[in-house]
Amino acid sequence: MTAPERVGAGPGFAPGALTVHHHPDELAKVTRALRATGRRITLVPTMGALHEGHLELIRRARRDSNSVVVVSIFVNPLQFGPGEDFTSYPRTFETDVEACRAEGVELVFAPDRDDVYGPDPQITVHPGPLGDELEGASRPGHFAGVLTIVAKLLGIVRPDLALFGEKDYQQLVLIRRMARELNIDTAIQGIPIVRAPDGLALSSRNVYLSEEERGAALALSAALAAGAHAGREGAEAVLRAAREVLATEPLVRLDYLELRDTELGAAPAEGEARLLVAAKVGETRLIDNALVLLGDQGDSRP
């Protein structure tokens, strides 16, 4: 994999302007110098193909006027399995850089694969048992790849805060766990899912959907809403309501629909839970999730 074309790259850091860095040592030197002046660093990790969900992360990051926002753009090969879409994953680097510029981002980190991993990487971060459940059951090795690149980014950038979208909820839980258990001194914050007006969770992979498939994909968010609405009646009612919605859409091939607690253990009898769904619509694999309030606390809807 070759490095993205160097767009607007320049040495160091220019306040109020965008600087693109490609080598880890370059960026680490800049963020170290910024911290020495009392500036905070906030990291927004992405694989590019930026959409409104990513831009919301950036806007949240920029709310802290003392923080310099670093957006990383790197399509991480370690988190793609055989037969997945690493080669075809959307790459829109120049457009992404311009989107970052428009949002007031001052640092973009767009490294080459070899600069991140070296010629013969041997070490990965093991996600533990949760890494083999839900997404991990369908995508073996995926979360080892995710945690490894996130650990590397946190080590290179040394941010005070890193923001992740809640759409990849299992990923968020595992990253928080990694930071806690490995004593990584970065606060990990989840940002609520950004949805299209019709309810579809925004994803870079939505571009793969045909018009018909996109309509069918709305069954995922509709199922979550139905499940959340049934929360007062308990866990079985939540799952039953969601399954009934999914069963009405023949183009949706369900992978899993599960109700867990907020740390992705067994669902509680009452209180906050998370309803998670994954399905293929056509050839595109989509995931979504929603908070559910079980028992007398009422219902919650995506």
Curated annotation (Swiss-Prot):
ATP binds at residues 47-54, 165-168, 194, 202-205. Keywords: ATP-binding, Cytoplasm, Ligase, Nucleotide-binding, Pantothenate biosynthesis. Pfam families: Pantoate_ligase (PF02569). It catalyses: (R)-pantoate + beta-alanine + ATP = (R)-pantothenate + AMP + diphosphate + H(+). Its main location: cytoplasm. One of its GO terms (biological process) is pantothenate biosynthetic process. GO terms for cellular component: cytosol. It is found in: Cytoplasm. Pathway: Cofactor biosynthesis; (R)-pantothenate biosynthesis; (R)-pantothenate from (R)-pantoate and beta-alanine: step 1/1. InterPro entries: Pantoate_ligase, Pantoate_ligase_C, Rossmann-like_a/b/a_fold. Its EC number is 6.3.2.1. One of its GO terms (molecular function) is pantoate-beta-alanine ligase activity. Beta-alanine binds at Q79. The active site is at H54 (proton donor). (R)-pantoate binds at Q79, Q171. Belongs to the pantothenate synthetase family. Homodimer. The reaction proceeds by a bi uni uni bi ping pong mechanism. Catalyzes the condensation of pantoate with beta-alanine in an ATP-dependent reaction via a pantoyl-adenylate intermediate. This is Pantothenate synthetase. It comes from Saccharopolyspora erythraea (strain ATCC 11635 / DSM 40517 / JCM 4748 / NBRC 13426 / NCIMB 8594 / NRRL 2338). The lineage of its organism: Bacteria, Bacillati, Actinomycetota, Actinomycetes, Pseudonocardiales.
